[in-house]
Amino acid sequence: MSGKYRGALNPVHEATYQFMGKLLQEVKDVFPDQLVHLGGDEVNFACWKNDAEITQFMEKQGYDYYAKLQTYYIQRIIKIVESLGKESAVWEDVAAKGQEGSVPKDTVIQVWRPRTWAQKMAQVTRHGLRTILSGCWYLDLISYGEDWPSYYRCDPHAFNGTKAQKDLVLGGEACLWGEFVDWTNLLPRLWPRASVIAERLWSSEDTPDMEDASVRLGEHRCRMVRRGIPAQPLHPSACPFLPV
């Protein structure tokens, strides 16, 4: 792309897929992980809308909206990943309503929208797709007061679905985006709130008692502070044997 519209790759050029094949080969060579995350969220279609070649391609293919073009692109990229013996993960945008069948069954869908995650988890698992939840756990978002209880209460299985659907939930992942986070505030923004999410995801279902968790996580926060980690308070409190 040239001009002021930059960002998305051109999905109608074969050179795009040649480049991505080489890039993903490097990813395979460097990282042993089986799962490769391909992204796919919040794609800005402005550059595609202003490219005559793309418009002509869409007309030829019968694509009436740009999400279909994105589906075409991601399908080809997933095939490259498969040829390398890896599996793909994508953001929920790729499996938009009506497009769930556009990705292979072994694709992992990461659900990120906070307000609609339960509906989306039900939707993608109904189509037999595995999923990871992030919609509850955005650590870059801050609020006044105690925000950790909402992280702790979130249950990735709390959506309308069968046992078979809920068996497709692999777990969850906390996200911390960097628009307003850098080295000056990363650690206090991250800790101990990430510990709250870790306990929720790695504990049995019968460990949801908030009062016990509050005491336990408060102690853990003090443990981190004693070790030199600038973990922010979870609630009004003071760590013993520390300056106040």
Predicted regions: what they are:
Residues M1-V108, W112-L129:
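Active-site neighborhood of glycoside hydrolase catalytic domains
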Residues S88-A96, E100-V244:
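Flexible, acidic glycine-rich loops studded with aromatic residues
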